[in-house]
Structures are given as C-alpha cells and as structure tokens.
Amino acid sequence: EIFQYEQYFHTGRLPLAHDASLDDLAGYLRRAAKAPGSMAVGRAYGQTDLTWLSASASVSEPFRRNRLFRGDMRLDERIYTQNLFVSPCVERSIVDKVFDRGADFYYFNLHGSDAPTACSFYASYQQQCYEAVTPRQLASAEKPNVVVTEACYGGKFQDYGRGETMLLAAMGDMTLLYLGSSRIAWGASKSSSAADLDNADRLTNVYMAKLLEGYTAGEAFYMARQRFFDYNDGYFTPHQALTIVEFNLFGDPFLHVGVRREGAKAHPRAVKALAKGAVNAVVERKCVR
C-alpha cells in the first residue's frame, strides 16, 4: 500500500568498492555538485541482445521521441538497427569501434551474471555466451551521464574492487545516475509498443520517459514502480513484485535531466487502478551462467 501515499523523500544509493576511500565518495559529490540539480542530455547510446531487439526498441522509444539517437544508417543492420547496437554482432573485439564515449545517456538490454568473475554485460546466441560490453567502456565515457541497464545483477558491487563491475566502473568515473538490478531481472523478447511492456522492460521505459520529462531521478523511479498498478487491478505477479524490489537507483535522487517541467511532481496512485489491457505474460531471465 506504500504507493497510495505521496513520497516526500526519495533515496539513491552510493556504491563503494571494497577498496574505496573517502576520495571516491568525495569524487562523486564533486561531480554531482557541478550539475546543480540538472544535467544536460543530448545524445543516447543503446545496446541490446538480438533476442530482445523488439522489446528494446519499445523500451527506448523516449530516446527517439526526444531525438537523442544519432541514427547512423550507414552501418550494417546486423550491427545497428532501430537505433540500437545489436549483440552478439557487437562484442568485445569491436565494441570500442561503436561505443559512443560522447553520449550522456546509456541503455543496455543485455545479460548479466552472478558469477564472481563475470563483470561485463553479455549476449547469448545458440547457447553460446559473448561479452558485449565491459566495465572499461563505461569508464571511458567522456561526459556526465545516466546509465540504465536491464541485465541480471547489473547493480552488483559488494565485495568488488574499484572499476571491477559495470556499476563501480560507471559510478567511479563520469556516471551520475545508474539504474540496475541487484539480482535476477525479468523481461520479454517481443513487444509491439510501450503499452505491452512488463517487468524490467516497463520499469526502465517509464523511468527514462519520466526523467526526460523533467522529473528528478527519485521521482522518476518512484513513478516507474507506481506504473505497475495500472494493470491487474493493482495486484502484482511474482515477477512484477521482484522487479519493484530488486531494481535500485544509484546516485543523487534529486538530479534531473534537462529543464525541469513546470509543475512536474510525482503523485500517489490508487491501489485499485483500472486495468488498461493485457501485457506480455512471457518472461525471460536476463542472466547467463
């Protein structure tokens, strides 16, 4: 029933490596202070597993609506289609050639893993696993940025050193906001529009849309979780409930992207919301083993 009430305080986590020092905390605070309440966003980079291309195109629709994709159609469609880079065609050996270091918003719909030495994001094809993007790429970003990932364990950081996971590499360098799951994430491979998204796909789509509408990161995350009340008369499936509790916002929850829209504010939602229609009931794990 928490979403019946207005949330006056929004929280974000600050992940610290096991070998972190006060300088790491101070470094993030200095970078956040340079973006006093707002950071400009002008270019987005998206990368997806081939299996999830349809869903990823729907999730990333807010980028197209705000004209944030570069749209380089000269690339082979096996590598780049629907404004997204596609893995496993884009994998470790070539990702440096396409990864946009000058972007300020990154979206990844790839696999993750809880294996201690598996710290990248991965693509899966014919029962083979391919390293799609590594912590080194995120650490090479040149501008203050936002990262959103649907990967399983995309938000893992405990017992790792500086830069050893995607989260620590990003937040230890130029990333100010990071949204990711601490455990298994669930999503679907097919989608015809944002209306039929569910689980991690819906959460990330709404979060990115609300950020780009001018809400703070904390408000956008709260509203993304609220959105699950739009279906099934306010009752959750097990996967929806897991999505709500396992995704975490890292960074300053009071930061917002671009110009804050007049009157933008998160409001409480009635628990018994009218169902708007069926959602995609097929769910898949976003993990590799």
Residue ranges of predicted features:
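Cysteine-dependent hydrolase recognition
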Residues: 1-289
